[in-house]
Amino acid sequence: MFSIYLVCVSIISGTVTGWTYPDQDHWASLCQTGTQQSPIPLSHSVSEDSDFPPFSIYGYGQNISILVKNNGHSAEVRQKTRTHIPEISGGGLPEVYQLDHLHFHWKSEHTIENYRFPLEMHLVHYAKRFGSTQGALKHPGGVAVFAVLFDLSPDDVQDFDPLLAEIATIQTKLNVPDELEGFVIKNYLPIDLAGFYRYNGSLTTPNCTEGIIWTVFTNTIPISKQQVEIFEKMRTVNDVILEQNYRSLQDINGRNVQLKVSPLRFMAGGSTINVATFSLIFLTCIITFT
């Protein structure tokens, strides 16, 4: 068993400090001068229909230990023991990527068809051959981020309760991690990963490093309004309520945005999946959770 430690992407991008979300117009470096910045508005009209092979995913079904921390910008978690690291390949990716961390944005950073979702989770990965995110960021395509969008459900999602209980505990406790056992990453992924947008962009926090491969899944997972509100009560380093922590939309600037259309549509509040549905999933997107 190993543990993961959820970390805000700004730490990964190079120890940039002193920035806030209300002050986005003054973010320095590539945040102002870059031409391939993230997030962007996504829609069928700006994308090109594409066909990608299925993803191959390893290690996302394990029960793991995590340390959850409020770093003043997001909920963060980082792996403590770098063994049995979750990996992903296929899906049009150029190589094998290993999971570095997860973090959350409320509301969503990306929009789809002009709709902004209540929550977005980023799974930040680095190319395995580089051995770390710091090394991978020096190479275009060295870092791949997978975005999972959450949509509102009338009911709480019980799988999320343990993590949200920890986040509630650290809302006002900055940079002091709490430990949680039995965290399963795949519980935070859509059932069907066959549909997604793919484009080249940047980190969404300073210093906004470019050369990032983005995958934004089109199928969402449910979360209740009450559960989202737990994120919205987190505090910043200045003891200000962090009601929102998303970057404004950036210009596409002629970039090629690809869309693989999912044969199925799983939205928040979806009911049980029958045998025929599962058969179709595995015919179109073979995913291994081990």
Protein language model features and the residues they cover:
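Alpha-carbonic anhydrase
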Residues: F2-T290
